[in-house]
From Swiss-Prot:
Species whose genome carries this gene: Burkholderia ambifaria (strain MC40-6)
Gene Ontology cellular component list: cytoplasm
Protein name as annotated: ATP phosphoribosyltransferase
Location in or out of the cell: Cytoplasm
Lineage: Bacteria, Pseudomonadati, Pseudomonadota, Betaproteobacteria, Burkholderiales
tRNA processing is among the record's keywords: no
Length: 217
């Protein structure tokens, strides 16, 4: 008996916005990860299961073949580097942007002048490093995993690099968005070996995902 395909997803917005894509492929997830304690979820297709992992771990599970394919944000993929992954489709879901934000009244233009030094808090260390290096700005990067908006408020950092959707959280903490680094959306990523060895099983799902993403789900 052939092992089922494994799809890696993270809880939250990506999971919810992937459900219509799965529905387009005729598949429903049998349990809700928000209420189930299970990390391996069956679907209505006996040849497909879903595993629930941290968003930042999706590329790793796919790269090493623990999952055949997955859905990950561009932010996660840029930090990961994309090694060992085939990225055939921008799914146009979980859209937002990665931006630089500073306290209201902070002179960002002066702070990033050539040769200046800036303390930046972020969990996107590699992306932030490349961004500021391209501008000729020396940065001290402070890696955080959450509550990024707090860092400038308590003097830990001058600025943050984080994902922004509506900007409401920034505004609530008296921060302003001063520079967009990149637009973010979630992409389908496929293990390169699985693409060759399980192509017949994968192709109908990948095609359905592509059609649904192009048609706005």
């Amino acid at each position: 008996m052939t092992a089922p395909l494994t799809l890696a997803l993270s809880k939250g917005r990506i999971f919810e916005e992937t459900l219509p894509l799965l529905a387009a492929a005729g598949v429903q997830v049998a349990e809700d990860p928000e209420t189930s304690r299970k990390l391996i979820l069956p679907t209505t297709d006996p040849n497909l299961r879903v595993i629930i992992v941290r968003a930042s771990d999706v590329p790793t599970y796919v790269e090493y073949g623990a999952a055949d394919f997955g859905v990950a944000g561009k932010d996660v993929l840029v930090e990961h580097g994309g090694s060992g992954l085939y990225q055939p489709i921008d799914l146009n879901i979980a859209r937002c942007r990665m931006s630089v934000a500073v306290p209201a009244g902070f002179d960002y233009a002066n702070a990033v002048r050539q040769g200046a030094r800036l303390r930046v808090a972020t969990k996107y260390v590699e992306t932030a490093r490349e961004h500021f290096a391209a501008k000729g700005v020396h940065v001290d990067l402070i890696k955080l995993y959450g509550s990024m908006e707090l860092a400038p408020l308590v003097g830990l950092a001058d600025a943050i690099v984080d994902l922004v959707s509506s900007g409401g959280t920034l505004k609530a903490n008296n921060l302003v968005e001063v520079e967009e680094i990149m637009a973010i959306s979630s992409r389908l990523v496929v293990n390169q070996a699985a693409l060759k060895l399980k192509r017949a099983a994968l192709k109908p799902i990948l095609d359905a995902f592509e059609r649904a993403s192009q048609n706005g789900n």
